[in-house]
Amino acid sequence: MDLKYLNQKEAIAVDQELFNDYKFSVDQLMELAGLSCAHAVAKCFPAEKHPRILVCCGPGNNGGDGLVAARHLALMGYTPTIYYPKPTAKPLFENLSHQCQQMDICDVKECPSVESAARDYDLILDALFGFSFKPPVRADFVAVVELMQQTKLPIASVDIPSGWDVEKGKLTECDVEPALLISLTAPKLCARQFRGEHHYLGGRFVPPALQRKYELNLPVYPGNELCVKL
């Protein structure tokens, strides 16, 4: 059977069942999702060739995934730098930021220019917006989305490429074009428009009964892998 691509309503419903029926905490799922993102990045962009990563984090759970991924990437030998233009004032996100600070992961307060990004980084991790995003992009994030639209650096997007509609995908020809898309839990409808080189599924935590209920038809993760190539 074919892999299912979720619409926005289905993606929200699956998340809510994980929280309410299966009693996962946000912390649990965020840690597993961010760890799987770090593993997918490591498979596609080894630290030997792409050591310096600009991790762009948004205000919601997608941004939290990015903070987790940054921490794990640092442990894997990368040098991540975090750009977090609108930090979330909740204990979970404050703790994730604190963990990164305690690991001496640098952050930048201003969005790099296209030129400075090309000089200072080898890869951008796009963890701005998740499946709850509805256009247009808010003012705080316009500069970083424009950076990703204009840069020649490879981009790895977490779940949804920033600025894309979760169901319709790209809204304009100049939208972000990631080289790696890491779909989490299950791919969303917008992933059908993905034309980059690498598409991975991460978030190896979906209970079999939930997979069957939504007919997700997820691929089998090989061995003890945390992500699987689609």
UniProtKB/Swiss-Prot annotation:
Disulphide bonds in the chain: none
Assigned EC number: 5.1.99.6
Residues involved in (6S)-NADPHX binding: 61-65, 130-136, 159
Record: residues binding K(+): 62, 126, 162
Note accompanying the cofactor annotation: Binds 1 potassium ion per subunit.
Domain YjeF N-terminal intervals: 11-218
Presence of the UniProt keyword Coiled coil in the record: no
SUPFAM superfamilies: YjeF N-terminal domain-like
Keywords: Isomerase, Metal-binding, NAD, NADP, Nucleotide-binding, Potassium
GO molecular function: metal ion binding; NAD(P)HX epimerase activity; nucleotide binding
GO cellular component: cytosol; mitochondrion
GO BP, sorted A to Z: metabolite repair
UniProt similarity note: Belongs to the NnrE/AIBP family.
NCBIfam families linked: yjeF_nterm
Name of protein: NAD(P)H-hydrate epimerase
Species of origin: Drosophila melanogaster
